[in-house]
Amino acid sequence: MKGLILVGGYGTRLRPLTLTLPKPLVEFGNKPMILHQVESLAAAGVKDIVLAVNYRPEVMIETLKKYEEKYGVNITFSVETEPLGTAGPLKLAEEILCKDDTPFFVLNSDVICDYPFAELAEFHKKNNAEATIVATKVEEPSKYGVIVHKQGTSKIDRFVEKPVEFVGNRINAGIYILNPSVVDLIDLRPTSIEKETFPQLAARESLYSFDLEGYWMDVGQPKDFLSGTCLYLSSLSKKNPEALVPTSEPYVTGGNVLVDPTAKISPQAKIGPNVVIGPGAVIGEGARLSRCVVLANSTIKPHAFVKNSIIGWNGRVGRWARIENVSVFGDDVEVKDEVYVNGGRVLPHKTISGNIEKPEIIM
């Protein structure tokens, strides 16, 4: 089988982290975001994976080529000379995606969930569909484009963008399985699969939706990255609890704590719930961490407080410092002792010596 991951562009919503690495290589749950998807595709029997990229492909090629042998897949980079939207990349990769008549998966690189690739393929085949969209239920459908089905079926009738009145609560989850014939509907230009291709398929009654069970999150911006981390850790606690630090560990409070084995943590620290600590990180005594991500080689000094924030690589948070309210630090940021940061977006290589009392970008 084949799969295409829409990697896309600059990752501006996740800056300042993406000033250092392309978004798919930023660690989510202590491994590059895109690796979650490559692993899941490989586990479902996918052998050919195409990455549609238009920003810094050389960094990704170097990193991802080493995963080919590990997962038994062929990874091809399809490099766009201009951004081609969500449908154009399929046409650009037509030679691989349409090399035989079997269907292929397409997914957005920002999406984190329990990827249901095997079940999706079975559903697609059973319904003799031309295209199948994974759908997820949301509490506030008025914020999204909503899927409307033909009554009593999983066949899609139409899409309603940000409906004022309730028409349904299922939205496009950014994961598809498509027959090669779908590529014939696409031109090699910047084009949207959601707005241009899917309505054509719905009109010929060959577009279906598959309901996703479990969690789903588009983690393309910091607050959603943190929410997605909580959902991922919660899923891990049910499906692979041995991956998490046991709650019997002295420093764990509240559970759902994921720590790289090379991190050094004081038994007198208080960590949790919903914390990820990367390789080489050092957490001092009395430090208090909750609902946060600490990336590789960062140091949280004694009695510092970090909540609802992302500490970038090689960061240093001083004694008794307080970091909260979706603060995001780029690479190599230092916060001095006793400094308060409230919602600061701090660019790489900065030193923060005074309080940041309201959310702002620190250049």
Swiss-Prot record:
Pathway: Nucleotide-sugar biosynthesis; GDP-alpha-D-mannose biosynthesis; GDP-alpha-D-mannose from alpha-D-mannose 1-phosphate (GTP route): step 1/1. Keywords: Cell cycle, Cytoplasm, GTP-binding, Nucleotide-binding, Nucleotidyltransferase, Transferase. It comes from the Eukaryota. One of its GO terms (cellular component) is cytoplasm. It is found in: Cytoplasm. Its main location: cytoplasm. The keyword Secreted does not apply. The keyword Nucleotide-binding applies. One of its GO terms (molecular function) is GTP binding. This is Mannose-1-phosphate guanyltransferase. Involved in cell wall synthesis where it is required for glycosylation. Involved in cell cycle progression through cell-size checkpoint. Belongs to the transferase hexapeptide repeat family. It catalyses: alpha-D-mannose 1-phosphate + GTP + H(+) = GDP-alpha-D-mannose + diphosphate. One of its GO terms (biological process) is protein glycosylation. Its EC number is 2.7.7.13. The gene is MPG1. It is an enzyme of class 2 (transferase).
